């Protein structure tokens, strides 16, 4: 399932992710997760790339082969699928542009062994080729995905469910997309 989370700025979409991941505590009540839930989370800041490494090392941990779910693939080919080819894979992560940083986070997160992906505005700073790679990656992902986005076109193409924050602490959940 791919759940799209929509709503106006300040409605609590990012707070929902922070509550799910334990980065924030609820004012009342409790957040209960299943025992097997393991999150892979990319926030809007895209700050988790390891400093002092090149792009390929940051995405693959320097491994020649990486696991994608239960499938083992060549790490250079995997990084290239996010539009990082040849010398781009050797760029220091500290020199990446916003769009490159976003693509690198997506690539790193998609190989993480989590079973629930949390994506906060994943389409920001993406070019059309990377957007398509993200769509294909999510379509083939074996787990669940929860996506916060204002990009209705993206949500229409991927979502099986929508959680719509409507303000004043009202939210609706329904099957289908926009």
List the predicted regions and their residue ranges.
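ABC ATP-binding cassette signature C-motif
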Residues: 1-178
């Amino acid at each position: 399932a791919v759940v799209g989370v929509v709503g106006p700025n300040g409605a609590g979409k990012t707070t929902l992710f922070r509550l799910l991941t334990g980065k924030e505590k609820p004012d009342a009540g409790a957040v209960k997760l299943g025992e097997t839930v393991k999150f892979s989370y990319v926030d809007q800041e895209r700050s988790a790339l390891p400093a002092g490494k090149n792009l390929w090392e940051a995405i693959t941990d320097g491994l020649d082969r990486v696991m994608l779910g239960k499938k083992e693939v060549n790490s250079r080919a995997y990084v290239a699928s996010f539009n990082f080819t040849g010398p781009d894979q050797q760029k220091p992560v500290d020199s990446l542009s916003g769009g490159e940083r976003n693509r690198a986070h997506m690539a790193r997160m998609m190989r993480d062994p989590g079973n629930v992906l949390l994506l906060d505005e994943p389409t920001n700073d993406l070019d059309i080729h990377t957007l398509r790679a993200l769509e294909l990656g999510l379509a083939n992902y074996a787990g669940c995905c929860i996506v916060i986005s204002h990009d209705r076109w993206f949500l229409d193409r991927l979502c099986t469910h929508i959680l719509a924050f409507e303000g004043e602490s009202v939210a609706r959940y329904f099957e289908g997309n926009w």
